[in-house]
Amino acid sequence: MIPAVVLLLLLLVEQAAALGEPQLCYILDAILFLYGIVLTLLYCRLKIQVRKAAIASYEKSDGVYTGLSTRNQETYETLKHEKPPQ
């Protein structure tokens, strides 16, 4: 019971100390704001790079729209029908 009361009092004291220095909160808010902007920019940059890489790899691959080419070897061979001797 006593440790719970002491813990509650410590939490209340910490809240009162945090309210006494609003300038520190403003500084921390500014740091978090800049951190969020930097992370957002890095995320957007990464998405753009991935999209450009996907487009480049799609253009390099043999896609559906590439032209047809002739084959050197025939697919089917002709059968040589020999008559059996009579």
Curated annotation (Swiss-Prot):
GO terms for cellular component: external side of plasma membrane; Fc-epsilon receptor I complex; Fc-gamma receptor III complex. Keywords: Cell membrane, Disulfide bond, IgE-binding protein, Immunity, Innate immunity, Membrane, Phosphoprotein, Receptor, Signal, Transmembrane, Transmembrane helix. The modification Phosphotyrosine is found at Y65, Y76. The keyword S-adenosyl-L-methionine does not apply. Residues 19-23 are extracellular. It is a single-pass type I membrane protein. Pfam families: ITAM, TCR_zetazeta. PROSITE patterns: ITAM_1 (PS51055). Residues 54-82 form the ITAM domain. It is found in: Cell membrane. The modification Phosphoserine is found at S69. Belongs to the CD3Z/FCER1G family. Adapter protein containing an immunoreceptor tyrosine-based activation motif (ITAM) that transduces activation signals from various immunoreceptors. As a component of the high-affinity immunoglobulin E (IgE) receptor, mediates allergic inflammatory signaling in mast cells. As a constitutive component of interleukin-3 receptor complex, selectively mediates interleukin 4/IL4 production by basophils priming T-cells toward effector T-helper 2 subset. Associates with pattern recognition receptors CLEC4D and CLEC4E to form a functional signaling complex in myeloid cells. This is High affinity immunoglobulin epsilon receptor subunit gamma. It comes from Macaca fascicularis (Crab-eating macaque).
